[in-house]
Amino acid sequence: MSRRATWLVSRPVEALRQIEEWPAEHVAAGLTSPTAVIAEQGDVGHRLGWGSVTKLLTAYATLIAAEEGALDLDEPAGPEGSTVRHLLAHASGLAWDSPAPLGRPGERRIYSNTGYVVLADHLARRTEMPFGEYLRVGVLEPLGLGATLEGDAAGGIVGTLGDMLAFGREALAPTLIAPETLTEATTVQFPGLEGVLPGFGRQTPNDWGLGFELRSGKSPHWTGTRNSHRTYGHFGSKPGTATFVWIDPERQLAAAAVADASFGGWAAAGWPTLSDALLEEVQQ
């Protein structure tokens, strides 16, 4: 049976057919409002690795722990002078994949997988629960996600497009954290820091919230030009998978896509094109 024959479309949104051209065997994309899926297409039930979209769930678990009083966002964590807030916002000074700091906290926006592993270890100590268990009972199960953590807190989630869209709905209209906590998480932390946005080069500034990457005025970027500057989310890239989820609070929409193909020029060009086409079509 051909891939096209197995695909599901919840309602006709022509823009979603762009994913047929992506260089992947299993690919899916969709759009949701705060309350329900608007459209989805592709291998929507296929599970694959989310890559760094995982960091949004790790950040959400941390925000829940902060609301519960298990930790404080401004308590020390990570290298000397760093806090939980620094780790969440890639401002701790830790390198991409090394425990050795590249700078002082609050000095530069250094995207760091290591920082999220350190954050998860800190969360586990403060909650007295293994990180994976806290994530499961605090985030995955309450949202009804079938996603599972099968690696580290920086990139180990495996799940479906539907799981990602469900998190997008949560990030539009939160049920697990207070609205004011989400507002703080989607507000730039340590304003003015420059840094490299992986795959898209140096950004000045490279705005980031608490886990959520902020679109702001970045160019080039993986979201579309029709996305509002208030858009937030994350993309993921690891060998054999490329994923994204964005949440646009001005449009009251979230979109996600998953593909079992490594990130490359097809994604850097195709994701913004898809995003713009979705926004143009759905909001006509």
What are these regions (language model features)?
Residues L94-A95, Y116, A261-F263:
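Solvent-exposed loop/turn segments at secondary-structure junctions
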Residues E25, L31, R85, P101-L102:
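N-terminal core-entry segment
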Residues L57-Y60, T114-A120, G162-A166:
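Well-ordered alpha-helical segments within folded domains of soluble proteins
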Residues G49-V53, L57, A65-P101, Y111, ...:
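Active-site helix/loop module of the DD-peptidase/beta-lactamase fold
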Residues L8-V9, Y60, A95:
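Intrinsically disordered, low-complexity segments enriched in polar/charged small residues
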Residues S2-G49, T54, E107-R108, A124-M129, ...:
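Catalytic loop of the DD-peptidase/beta-lactamase superfamily, centered on the K-T-G motif
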